[in-house]
């Protein structure tokens, strides 16, 4: 089995430190971690992170709850860099499966990190939704 270690952080100093560590293969973050790290503007802070971490994979999460807006944000986030994965929660705040969002972004060959996955049923739905040609990370909690 191959295991890759990803840091779930948003603090720039810690990202700099772990980015130089070969054991760490990439990063993931989310809007609440970024707020906690002092980010005032999501996009500009994300781009600061990308100046530090421009070779290892990094996931930036959509923060919209509406499928149309999630897709729009996902497309925009994807354009920030070749090492970017778009992080999409498996369900929205209404407990609805985000399959439409996942399918749409995946069909555009956008790399995804599908997050907040808690059940085998959710994992199975994701696997039925993705095209399996484009890179996808499934973050199981």
Locate the predicted segments by residue.
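Catalytic alpha/beta core domains of metabolic enzymes, predominantly
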Residues: 110-141
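Active-site beta->alpha loop and helix N-cap motifs at the rims of alpha/beta catalytic domains
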Residues: 2-3, 9-16, 21-24, 28-108, ...
